[in-house]
């Protein structure tokens, strides 16, 4: 059954299938996802660190591989965000704790490497509560992540930013 959802709202596996079938390019898919971030993030504060330039370069490389019929892995060209607590080279990893505000990742976390080894295109990091341990997603570095369905309510803690980014 074909999904009636816009491509940027479909599952990562559906997006990967569309990319491999060349129904959409990695750059087009990234731009659709990024447009949603730009539209909704000012109100929601889910994506708190981003590197769209790096993501666009990765999308261009993925498009070349996909065009050649040589995908890197199952997620080649699929745009994704990761939780702020995972190291992503050159970006802050603070766990929402002001004591770690100057901590810049020198390498990628193992979990992130496993995603990128499969071709995932990381564009940003999502908000977390202090030390990932609260029922909501607030910290003194990045502020509060708001529930997309009712901004007066919390989206949950630990992975609240990730949940809102998906919603």
Regions from the language model: what does each represent?
Residues 36, 40, 58, 62, ...:
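Short alpha-helical functional segments enriched in proximate histidine and acidic residues
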């Amino acid at each position: 059954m074909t999904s009636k959802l816009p491509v940027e709202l479909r599952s990562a596996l559906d997006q990967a299938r569309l990319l491999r079938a060349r129904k959409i390019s990695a750059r087009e898919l990234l731009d659709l996802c990024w447009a949603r971030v730009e539209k909704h993030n000012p109100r929601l504060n889910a994506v708190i660190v981003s590197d769209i330039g790096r993501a666009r370069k990765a999308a261009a490389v993925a498009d070349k591989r996909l065009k050649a019929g040589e995908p890197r892995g199952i997620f080649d060209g699929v745009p994704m965000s990761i939780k702020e607590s995972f190291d992503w080279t050159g970006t802050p990893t603070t766990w929402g704790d002001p004591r770690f505000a100057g901590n810049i990742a020198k390498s990628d976390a193992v979990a992130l490497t496993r995603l990128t080894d499969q071709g995932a295109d990381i564009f940003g990091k999502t908000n977390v509560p202090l030390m990932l341990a609260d029922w909501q997603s607030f910290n003194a570095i990045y502020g509060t992540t708001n529930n997309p369905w009712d901004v007066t309510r919390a989206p949950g803690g630990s992975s609240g930013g990730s949940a809102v980014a998906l919603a």
